[in-house]
A protein has these predicted regions:
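Structural beta-strand/beta-sheet cores of well-ordered domains, especially the beta-sheet scaffolds
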Residues: 5, 14-16, 85-87, 99-101
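A common structural junction motif
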Residues: 3-8, 47-48, 122-128
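A generic structural motif
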Residues: 15-23, 101-103, 137-139
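A generic structural signal for short, solvent-exposed coil/turn residues
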Residues: 10-12, 81, 95, 122-124
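Short, well-ordered coil/turn elements that cap or connect secondary structure elements
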Residues: 2-4, 13, 84, 124-125, ...
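An extended, acidic, His-containing surface patch that forms the Zn2+-binding/catalytic region
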Residues: 28-96, 106, 110-115, 129-169
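Fold-level recognition of mixed alpha/beta catalytic cores in primary-metabolism enzymes, strongest
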Residues: 1-38, 42
């Protein structure tokens, strides 16, 4: 096996343990993060370290990890108040003999959970299954409302800053 950036190969029993070393962050602001699962998925695919069924699953997972904007899954979108959708791969684990990859998304008001789930199912095809989907409608309060103005004015008065309100998932 070949070495790769942010991948370590460690002898283990009769095989090799492949570890990915990423950079953590938050699903609402994933810029600059590197998902270790995505690194390992790419390494396995690039080096042909999977059978056909595993390849189909890994290709589906790769679509999640290819872009924190959801491009690989066909769910990328943006609107004025919220900006672009963000999505990250969370934890991967073995559950009842099946690999499970969690994901976490913050999406703008121009889409909804049902639409996103439908788009993800279309993108992953038969390589994986999307289950346990939960979503909440985006919540937004205009920056010029009295409550938000009171909060930011108080913050600026206490800190001496000149901060402005911002939206995050």
């Amino acid at each position: 096996l070949r070495n790769a950036p942010n991948i370590t190969l460690e002898p283990e029993g009769d095989g090799v343990r492949i570890r990915g070393w990423g950079k953590s962050g938050h699903a609402a602001m994933p810029e600059g993060t590197v998902n270790a699962i995505g690194l390992v998925v790419n390494y396995l695919l690039d080096n042909g370290l999977c059978n056909d069924a595993e390849r189909a699953y890994l290709e589906a997972v790769k679509k999640l990890h290819d872009s924190t904007a959801g491009v690989g899954l066909g769910i990328d979108c943006a609107d004025g108040p919220f900006g672009p959708l963000t999505i990250i791969g969370g934890k991967m684990s073995m559950v009842d003999g099946r690999m499970v990859q969690t994901m976490d998304s913050r999406y703008p008001t121009c889409t909804d959970g049902d639409t996103i789930a439908k788009q993800i199912r279309a993108a992953i095809g038969t390589g994986a299954e999307l289950t346990d989907v939960g979503s909440a409608k985006p919540f937004y309060i205009e920056a010029d409302t009295p409550a938000i103005k009171a909060c930011i004015d108080t913050y600026n008065e206490v800190t001496g800053d000149n901060a402005t309100p911002f939206t995050m998932g």
